[in-house]
Amino acid sequence: MYKRQGLYNTGILGAISEFGSYCISITGVIGVLYRPLMLIAYSEGRHDDLVRTVVDGAYIVGLISSLLCGIVMGLSVPILKVWLNDEISHYWLWLVIKMFIIPITTFGSTYSIIYNLWNNVRSSALWSLAIAVIYVGTSVVLLELGVNMTAFLIIGAVAAIMQGAVLHIAIYSHIYPQSMPKVYVRLWRCCAYFALVFGLSFAIDYFINASNLFTLLVEGVLALLVALCVAPIFINAEDLDALDVILPIKTVMRWLNFNWTRQNA
């Protein structure tokens, strides 16, 4: 790649991709937390519980990923400016493209546990291979045509979404088709929250325009608080129960309410 795009651009992309790897690691850990519950439900033949766990778990993981990646996307310019330098900040769109795929693929990859439990991995392997071959072939053609790095990244993002989200959900739909309407609704709501967090974070950076670490931290905290304030629009009681499995939010709320009641008794 470096012969076509240049060593400088390739180095910038490598640094940006490294930042994306941090976000993928965080969201990946969150997604794994639901897998033992899915395995237990499947082993006991509780398929309704299995479907509910995977659908709710995918949504919670998607929301958390949307929160993290939406903020990073909205603050992509100051992040690159402070982390690397002002010149690199002009490549903020590359970071946006890298972050864009994470919530979608994190949401979709949660469903991959289902066909693994059913030992139906052949379809996934064959389709993944087909997508990879098409992607590599397309990339080679684009590089020979001399297209810019942005177009190359967009093609890669499309391939990643196809393999990491569309493929997993499509195979899942053949196993538990009755739950697909809820899956589509959850995916739409997750994308809506993702877009909202990105827009709000971008607006915060527009007004503050961070240029150093302190102002960047201020922007990050403000973006996080605003994103958490709008989160209840996308979360209901069922989602709170699913979230409480990995983060004891309801337990903490009950503890705070108990202490407040005791102090005011």
Where are the model-predicted features located?
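Interfacial/gating helices of multi-pass transporter permease domains
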Residues: K3-S21, S89-L93
